[in-house]
Amino acid sequence: ASESAAAVPLADPPAPFLKVRIAGRFDHAREGLLGLEVRGPVLGAHLVTPLLRDGAPPVLVNRGWVPLEGNRPVARPDGPVVVEGWVHPGDRPGTFSATDDAAARRFYTFDPPAIGRALGLPQVAPYGLVVLGPSGGLPDPARTLPRPTNNHLGYVITWYGLALALVGVLAAFAFRRGRPR
């Protein structure tokens, strides 16, 4: 239902994963790349651009996927823009997270305060926005709201497989105990 719902104006603080609309101007001079993602044979990353707002801290916007190599043109709108997407509450680096390279503006964990400092914006919003939209150029935005993983079939196969194996072990044990010596 929320997928087809209209985006609402950004409230401060916003609810995580809420579909919102926000206005401002992109600061393309302070872009960075987030993560690594392979699409087909092409390695790419997500383009993160600060959105400057009047009277409010900048918001880091994940505008979508871009290839790391090649010279395909990436859209960089000038002037005022209105962006729709979902609120990304930010992540904290884990024990096995890759180390960010602030000098190269390469980030592997979406931590808005840390990314903001690395991009020269010490006062960014503690959340970000992931742009939603149709494919049709670069950057290639997300098309759906995030969904939790659904591993139910895998769990069913695992647990029924273990139960079947246990029945087999018990049958072998009972057969051996029941044989005369």
Residue ranges and their predicted role:
Residues 1-181:
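Surface-exposed, charge/polar-rich loops and edge strands
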